[in-house]
Amino acid sequence: MAEEVWVGTWRPHRPRGPIMALYSSPGPKYLIPPTTGFVKQTPTKLRAPAYSFRGAPMLLAENCSPGPRYSVNPKILRTGKDLGPAYSILGRYHTKTTLTPGPGDYFPEKSTKHVFDSAPSHSISARTKTFRVDSTPGPAAYMLPMVMGPHTIGKVSQPSFSIKGRSKLGSFSDDLHKTPGPAAYRQTDVQVTKFKAPQYTMAARVEPPGDKTLKPGPGAHSPEKVTMTRPCAPVVSFGIKHSDYMTPLVVDVD
């Protein structure tokens, strides 16, 4: 074996671990489920009752009432506080002084016109601004309807005539060379009013259907390689070496 030529970097050596393909039965990878305990127990056996041990419960405190932090007022009863009237002393309120008119604010000499008869008095004031911004339309703001023409309103209108320009057709200045000639009119087809003659169309030559696929020629065949009708020597083919660790494929043909 030392004289053989090795291909690649692989060299024969002992396996570093167990190869599972070498074992014909389930190896240590498949463990039988245990019959004791609670986790992963075998389903084929009856399971006995399991008990668990727990620590001792904590003892409650002897005094469960609130401590001295909560001092209940002895004057508070179930109906409320049992207290006498209590008063508090506050400062004086600030009173707001009202401004009243004094003796100099009155004019008794002007009260004679309210008690005795007095002559009428007039006052001259400036002109008001309401006349300047008056939006009432003036005489020139109205547009009276027309009394002449065909569009009168509330009046009977007379007949109106319009004068039109002279027509260029048939006048002395009409150019007769621009009139259409006999060739400008389309002649009516006779077959529209008369019997229509039969019409024929000539089509291209019709080829019969055939096979246009490419066929092999004489040079495409190799009669010397035919071994079905002639005896030939046995032929051997080289295959690959199958591994001893590969499971063969078994197909159920039934």
UniProtKB/Swiss-Prot annotation:
STPGR repeats lie at residues 180-205, 216-241. InterPro entries: CIMAP, SHIPPO-rpt. The keyword Lipid metabolism does not apply. One of its GO terms (cellular component) is cytoskeleton. Keywords: Cell projection, Cilium, Cytoplasm, Cytoskeleton, Developmental protein, Differentiation, Flagellum, Repeat, Spermatogenesis. 'Shippo' is a Japanese word for tail. Microtubule inner protein component of sperm flagellar doublet microtubules. PANTHER family: OUTER DENSE FIBER PROTEIN 3 (PTHR21580:SF23), SHIPPO-1-RELATED (PTHR21580). This is Ciliary microtubule associated protein 1A. It comes from Bos taurus. The lineage of its organism: Eukaryota, Metazoa, Chordata, Craniata, Vertebrata. The gene is CIMAP1A.
